[in-house]
Swiss-Prot record:
This is Rathke gland glycoprotein. Rathke gland secretions may function as pheromones, as predator repellents, or contribute to the maintenance of the turtle shell. It is found in: Secreted. Keywords: Glycoprotein, Secreted. One of its GO terms (cellular component) is extracellular region. Glycosylated. The keyword Nucleus does not apply. The lineage of its organism: Eukaryota, Metazoa, Chordata, Craniata, Vertebrata.
Amino acid sequence: SDDDGTVVLTTSGPIRGKRLQVGSAAVTAF
């Protein structure tokens, strides 16, 4: 799947970036 431009919801609010799957958690890289 293409994760570029994915909007990731975090405790700080929605963040746009590339979603990377790390372990069982998803982080956002720019």
